[in-house]
């Protein structure tokens, strides 16, 4: 059975900005295709078949809940899993300083 998922406000904002940039840069067809790629990866996470990695090895802090990431297109989907659902914490471009951004996200996920 697939897990339900939800987005944090930060994840919603990041997805909106990605959609806007992709639309303005590459047009509506590519924006729609990239949105579908992201939705497909979210479905794969929900079904437990996404290739993911723990962020713990990139962090100097311990978190109560493991923060995971998976790659789609030019972005990383950062999320936390729970028994019945997962929460998309943020979407980061592959060129960001991943350990620094993950530390910030993980510190917020502690609460």
How would you label these PLM feature ranges?
Residues 1-41:
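Arg/Lys-rich, positively charged N-terminal/basic patches that mediate binding to nucleic acids
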Residues 1-6, 15, 37, 49, ...:
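Solvent-exposed, well-ordered amphipathic alpha-helical segments
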Residues 29, 33-40, 52, 56, ...:
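Residue-level signal for alpha-helical context at structural boundaries
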Residues 41-47:
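Short, basic alpha-helical nucleic acid-contact segments in DNA-binding proteins
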Residues 48-86:
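Basic/aromatic recognition patch in beta-strand/loop cores that engages polyanionic ligands
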Residues 72-76, 80-111:
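Enriched for short, Lys/Arg-rich terminal
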């Amino acid at each position: 059975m697939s897990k339900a998922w939800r987005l944090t406000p930060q994840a919603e904002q990041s997805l909106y900005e990605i959609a806007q940039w992709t639309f303005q840069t590459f047009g509506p067809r590519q924006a729609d295709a990239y949105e579908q790629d992201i939705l497909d990866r979210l479905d794969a996470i929900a079904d437990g078949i996404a290739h993911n990695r723990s962020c713990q090895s990139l962090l100097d802090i311990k978190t109560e809940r493991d923060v995971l990431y998976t790659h789609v297109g030019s972005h990383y989907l950062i999320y936390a899993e729970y028994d019945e659902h997962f929460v998309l914490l943020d979407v980061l471009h592959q060129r960001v300083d991943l350990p620094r951004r993950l530390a910030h996200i993980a510190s917020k996920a502690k609460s």
